[in-house]
């Protein structure tokens, strides 16, 4: 013991420096006193000694917990002070702003990092875990390690590429994989953030979907999207599912394979004879050609009757003839339409002249028949008609209606309407003289000639204007002259109407002068007196022929006055037309000279 103590010396603890007690004034030198029981190598092994390792550990833990408790108390005090400050500020602001701030504060914990979270340490830990996983997979494939030497260099290069591809993808703070250039071509040569923090990108407004398709293995779309090239392709793992979900497989599973299907039973003949069952190979079920009926109810054994063949041929011939007739008729109609479309104005005038001739013939026939019926009718029928007329019709009213009718006929402009009116007037007065009728015919022929000359003159003018190139100035002059002509024509028409009105007024005055004047205002008494006079006259002249002569003479005088008026009017019209024709010829000649 002593030798050991002297040779080795006393082992001092960390609290002693150079064999002196730092805490007290006494300096004890254990080397001088050897062989004592105060050796630290012995005392440190005791559990009750403060310098023992477990006691030192407990002390350190107690110190750390105490320091952490103090730190936590400080943080709580700081938070409390902040909260009190917030409440003071909130008391000063409005109610709406206070509610907004309170709601924001209620949700603010979602955006605060969890206490004790270090992103760098977490990232490093994840990287280590991935490394361990990769090493485990390489150690688990010993066959691959054995065959490495036997592979060529190209295969080794391919393995290196696969290892490069299997590099761990960079992830964000929450452990989600970030899109890289390898997966998305859009991100090639994209600008990077200077801070080095991985951020979410949307280059050129292209949405980068950080998802992987399970069918094709590409990034940017999922298995059900349209972008996937294998959208409609049936994968091998889906074939089993489709077969399992197919209802036909379930039906086949429920049915017995030995039993025939319904459509097969329908095709095969039945076994029971009452249900139409038969054996198709049976000789009594064979169809013979002799038993087949033809269309006409006979058998096909004999030849077809000749009468049927004849009837069929005649029917066909009739049909063909009908078709030919129809075709001929249609071709004729087409030719006629072509001719009518290509026909000139001369052909139209010819047709119009033919129609006029027909109308003249008809009017002559009507006139002859009316005159015959008028002459052949007896005196009794004349008396009856005269009595009816005197009963129902007022003579003054009849005169007024005749005058009104004549005025209307003069106002009508159309040429054919005027002709028709003249024919009516001729028929209405059968006792007109032959001289008057000759005069009317000559007058109408003159009017026709003047109209034909006028039309031909207009046609020549149109042809000349279409052939000769006219300058813009001459065209303007022509338009101005045509406007003047129209004004002159309007003035002439107005003069004609005024002349007609004056003539009608003069006629009415003459008639009123011829009528017997009376001072009685009562119209009924006047009508009675007129009727009495007519009766008296008729009774005095018992002979109806004398009465008819008297009637004819009165009519003749009226017709003479009308014919004189018409002749005056026609002369006026002819003179105006001649003046217009001369003025047009003069203008036409002046235009030709200018051109």
From Swiss-Prot:
Residues 316-331, 351-364, 584-595 have a biased composition (Basic residues). Residues 120-133, 161-174, 256-267, 414-428, 470-539, 547-565 have a biased composition (Basic and acidic residues). It comes from the Eukaryota. InterPro entries: CIR1, CIR_N_dom, Znf-CCHC_6. A zinc finger (CCHC-type) spans 211-228. GO terms for molecular function: transcription corepressor activity; zinc ion binding. Residues 112-180, 254-290, 310-595 are annotated as: Disordered. Pfam families: Cir_N, zf-CCHC_6. Transmembrane segments: none annotated. Keywords: Metal-binding, Zinc, Zinc-finger. PANTHER family: CBF1 INTERACTING COREPRESSOR CIR, COREPRESSOR INTERACTING WITH RBPJ 1. This is Uncharacterized zinc finger CCHC domain-containing protein At4g19190. It comes from Arabidopsis thaliana (Mouse-ear cress).
């Amino acid at each position: 013991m002593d030798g050991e103590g002297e040779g080795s010396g006393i082992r001092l603890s960390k609290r002693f420096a150079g064999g002196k007690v730092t805490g007290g004034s006494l300096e004890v030198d254990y080397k001088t006193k050897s062989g004592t029981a105060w050796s630290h190598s012995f005392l440190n092994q005791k559990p009750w000694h403060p310098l023992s390792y477990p006691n030192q550990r407990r002390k350190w833990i107690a110190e750390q917990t105490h320091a952490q408790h103090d730190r936590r108390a400080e943080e709580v005090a700081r938070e409390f002070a902040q909260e009190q400050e917030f409440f003071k500020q909130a008391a000063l602001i409005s109610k709406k702003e206070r509610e907004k701030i309170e709601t924001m504060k209620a949700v603010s914990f979602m955006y605060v990092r969890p206490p004790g979270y270090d992103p760098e340490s977490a990232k490093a830990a994840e990287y280590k875990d991935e490394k361990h996983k990769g090493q485990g997979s390489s150690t688990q494939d010993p066959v691959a390690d054995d065959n490495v030497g036997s592979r060529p260099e190209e295969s080794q290069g391919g393995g290196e590429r696969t290892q490069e591809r299997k590099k761990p993808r960079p992830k964000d703070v929450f452990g989600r994989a970030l899109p890289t250039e390898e997966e998305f071509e859009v991100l090639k040569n994209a600008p990077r953030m200077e801070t080095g923090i991985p951020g979410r990108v949307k280059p050129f407004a292209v949405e980068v979907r950080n998802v992987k398709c399970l069918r094709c293995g590409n990034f940017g779309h999922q298995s059900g999207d349209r972008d996937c090239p294998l959208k409609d392709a049936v994968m091998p793992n889906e074939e089993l599912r489709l077969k399992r979900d197919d209802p036909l497989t379930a039906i086949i599973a429920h049915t017995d394979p030995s039993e025939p299907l319904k459509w097969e039973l329908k095709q095969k003949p039945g076994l029971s004879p009452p249900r139409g069952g038969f054996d198709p190979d049976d000789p009594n079920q064979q169809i013979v050609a002799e038993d087949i009926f033809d269309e006409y109810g006979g058998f096909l054994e004999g030849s077809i009757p000749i009468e049927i063949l004849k009837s069929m041929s005649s029917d066909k011939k009739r049909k063909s003839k009908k078709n030919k007739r129809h075709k001929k008729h249609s071709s004729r109609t087409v030719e006629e339409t072509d001719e009518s479309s290509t026909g000139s104005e001369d052909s139209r005038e010819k047709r119009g002249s033919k129609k006029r001739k027909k109308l003249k013939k008809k009017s002559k026939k009507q006139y002859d028949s009316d005159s015959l019926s008028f002459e052949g009718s007896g005196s009794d029928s004349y008396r009856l008609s005269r009595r009816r007329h005197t009963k129902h019709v007022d003579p003054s009213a009849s005169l007024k209606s005749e005058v009104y009718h004549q005025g209307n006929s003069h106002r009508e402009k159309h040429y054919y309407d005027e002709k028709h009116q003249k024919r009516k007037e001729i028929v209405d007065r059968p006792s007109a003289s032959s001289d008057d009728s000759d005069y009317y015919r000559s007058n109408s022929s003159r009017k026709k000639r003047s109209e034909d000359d006028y039309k031909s003159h207009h046609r020549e003018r149109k042809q000349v204007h279409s052939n000769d190139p006219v300058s813009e100035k001459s065209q303007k002059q022509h338009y101005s002259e045509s406007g003047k002509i129209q004004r002159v024509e309007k003035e002439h028409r107005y003069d004609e109407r005024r002349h007609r009105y004056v003539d009608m007024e003069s006629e009415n005055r003459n008639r009123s002068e011829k009528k017997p004047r009376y001072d009685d205002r009562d119209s009924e008494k006047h009508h009675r007196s007129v009727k009495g006079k007519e009766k008296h006259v008729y009774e005095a002249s018992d002979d109806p022929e004398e009465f008819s002569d008297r009637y004819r003479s009165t009519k003749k005088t009226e017709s003479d006055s009308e014919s004189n008026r018409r002749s005056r009017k026609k002369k006026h019209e002819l003179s105006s037309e001649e003046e217009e024709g001369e003025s047009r010829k003069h203008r036409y000649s002046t235009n030709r000279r200018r051109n």
